[in-house]
Design a protein with these regions (language model features):
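One-carbon transfer enzymes
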Residues: 1-195
Length: 197
């Protein structure tokens, strides 16, 4: 298991959780360091699964497994690529989002799609409710994908090229209420930041 870097506030909690499950934890300083690549290659891994990992994974690491890296992304790609689709879908007034499981490539959230599952956004949903519910949807979909992977190669559906709505993280300037917006936009904004931001 690869987790957050040592300077991340969740490092020790995550590492202790991994050890409590009697799994191997691999420490690293940089994702492209030769020691890490060799450790992954030595494990003879078929594929790696990535969830909530906001660092770009270099090609040399992506190629260290037999079939590559698989990412669980909380949106219906190609819409809302990036690190915070949860807030963006609420702020934009979307009524549907979902989870995409896809192969990783050199860019963020642009790899071939394996599977998708839509999710209806309730009218009073917050970032927190969507985050929690999409985690459940993502786990269920990932289990289906991994079971299928045990018996056959996974499908690879190319994502279309083009400009799509971004799911990037919020900038500091975006964390303040703009009172020039409508009441509906402000209400969505508050829900989009509740409870994490």
């Amino acid at each position: 298991v690869l987790g957050p870097k040592k300077d991340h506030n969740m490092y020790y909690d995550f590492k202790n959780f991994v050890y409590s499950r009697r799994l191997n934890y691999v420490d690293y300083d940089e994702l492209d360091e030769p020691q890490l690549i060799e450790k992954i290659r030595a494990l003879n891994v078929d594929a790696a699964v990535v969830c909530s990992f906001n660092y770009k994974i270099p090609r040399i690491l992506l190629e260290a497994t037999k079939d590559g890296f698989i990412n669980v992304h909380p949106s219906m790609l190609p819409k809302y690529r990036g690190g915070n689709p949860y807030s963006r879908v609420i702020m934009n007034g979307e009524t549907e989002t979902g989870v995409t499981i896809h192969f990783m490539d050199d860019s963020f959230d642009t790899g071939d799609i394996i599977a998708q599952k839509p999710y209806h956004i309730h009218s009073k949903a917050t970032m927190g409710t969507i985050f929690n519910e999409l985690n459940v949807v993502g786990i269920e979909l990932l289990l289906q994908v991994l079971r299928a992977y045990e018996v056959q190669p996974l499908p690879r559906i190319k994502q279309p090229n083009g400009d799509f709505i971004s799911g990037k993280g919020l900038s500091e300037q975006e964390l303040f209420i703009n009172y020039n917006k409508t009441a509906e936009e402000i209400e969505r904004f508050v829900r989009a930041l509740n409870p994490f931001i």
